[in-house]
Amino acid sequence: RSTLFPYTTLFRSHEGIGRTGVVGVLRQGDGTRRLGLRADMDALPIVEATGLGYSSCHGGRMHACGHDGHTAMLLGAARYLAATRRFDGTLVLIFQPAEEGQGGAEAMLADGLLERFPCDALFGMHNMPGLEAGHLGFRAGPMMASQDLLSVTLEGVGGHGSMPHLSVDPLLAASSAVMALQSVVARNVDPQKAAVVTVGALQAGEAANVIPQRAVLRLSLRALDGQVREQVLQRVRQIIELQAASYGCQASIEHYPAYPVLVNSVEETEFARQVGVELAGAEQVAADRLGQRPVVERG
């Protein structure tokens, strides 16, 4: 907001959209087109010790995430557009909070973002560590994977490690489920389509000689197609429930849908690619390399 302040005579600034989102609107000429440029941000739990004038005002929180670089880039674009005004129509600059976790985009949409600021097309960009510095990448169609998070609790009967016959071991059931889940993509998903099932945590017990009462698994699922996503979700649920039952345990599954597949429209993607070629040169546009494989590494 403070960066846009010097240009308030040019930008109409709107704050508090989706709680902390900011939108800047800039008009030029008589054009009727309305294009949106969107950037996001995500603070990290880091103590900022840079001493810079724009350092975080909140202890233990720093805008050091890669997504915060997106906001810095859009602020740079705002200053350039306000200074040069080389366009005809309306530009809507969307500064979205909470790219991950809290779902800032959903909050802004629920707050009437697109009803208040309708756009003919929306453009955004994401830094890509896999691309060489100075290069741009474009891909029409599925670009970034959906993400679903699962928290699984397996309930058994705890007991002493010397008397396993009097217990129902949820850790054994959880271990078996982890191994069985490796078959979901390998034996259920079309090899020409992409999906990932990751068990990122298995938590159970505290003592070497005690069989725990419960075990907890935390999973993330990713897919680049809606049908594949549903297929993976169904098989994961089925495997967990049946593996738990086979060891005499009860399974409860909490599902947290995070994000759908990001799908880039063909026409707008090609338009952006052509602009990239004009600005940076064809040799700097990595359309072929990026186009070979969509991105499943997300958040």
List the model feature ranges, each with a label.
Residues T71-A78:
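DPxDG-like acidic metal-binding loop motif
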Residues G24-G31:
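Short beta-strand-to-loop junctions in surface cap/lid or active-site-entrance loops
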Residues T3-L10:
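Short, small-residue-biased leader/transition segments that mark boundaries at the very start
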Residues S175-G299:
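Metal-dependent amide/peptide-bond hydrolase catalytic core
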Residues R12-I17:
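Short, well-structured beta-strand/strand-turn elements
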Residues V22-V23, A43-M62, D68-G69, L81, ...:
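Histidine/acidic-residue-rich, glycine-tolerant segments that coordinate divalent metal ions
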